[in-house]
A protein has these predicted regions:
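Conserved short alpha-helical segments that host acidic/polar catalytic motifs at enzyme active sites
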Residues: 1-50, 54-212
């Protein structure tokens, strides 16, 4: 892929990476329908990726005048806009418990989306990554768990480890890394996540886990 060449030739560094390969179930194959989706809230970047099918009738429900509207045609972007609207309505970012309220808002949102269809969701902002594991289409064509897999690594001092294949590597001094994917990307011991699991990851570690 040309993207691999770009990553190999440009020394990009970040603490959070979201990558998404889309099987287009809703909307045309266009840039505006390409994940991950990004919005601004509270002066921060919020990023969202979804794997599954939530149907085509998502709406903002009780939100009378939604601030966040989809640019493209996908169910995933419509769901993201709905999540951001609920964060606006329910979270005061200045409160000391804002992180807990964000987690609870995300968990309730994910549970609702799961009732519509497969809802494997990753949402990240301000160094915090939240995810909801559901079900997905497996190799035999059956929709069932697991929808996401987790691998936790500790990179020893000065070590550089390939995430999967070439192009993306994890390096640092005593760095903890958490990798989440639809399927295991390496031969290591990936852990399947139970359906309904909501996890909060920070600095490469799982900080909170709940079932919803």
């Amino acid at each position: 892929s040309p993207w691999i060449t770009c990553l190999e030739t440009h020394p990009l560094r970040t603490s959070t990476v979201l990558a998404h390969i889309r099987h287009a179930t809703h909307g045309a194959i266009t840039l505006e329908n390409t994940q991950p989706f990004v919005r601004e809230l509270w002066g921060r970047v919020h990023v969202f990726a979804h794997n599954g099918d939530l149907g085509s009738n998502l709406s903002h429900g009780s939100v009378a005048a939604p601030r966040y509207r989809a640019i493209g045609e996908t169910d995933s972007e419509a769901a993201f806009c709905l999540l951001v609207e609920r964060l606006v309505a329910g979270v005061d970012p200045a409160r000391v418990d804002a992180g807990d309220v964000i987690f609870e808002t995300f968990a309730a949102f994910a549970r609702e989306m799961r009732e519509r269809g497969p809802a494997n969701i990753i949402y990240a902002s301000n160094g915090r990554l939240l995810l909801h594991a559901d079900r997905r289409t497996q190799a035999p064509g059956v929709i069932e768990p697991p929808g996401l897999w987790l691998l936790e690594r500790h990179c020893s001092d000065g070590a550089t480890v390939a995430v999967a294949g070439e192009g993306v590597h994890v390096a640092g001094v005593g760095v903890d890394v958490a990798l989440v994917a639809s399927v295991p990307l390496t031969g290591e011991r990936w852990r399947p996540l139970e359906q309904g699991s909501v996890l909060q990851l920070e600095y490469g570690r799982v900080r909170r886990t709940e079932r919803v």
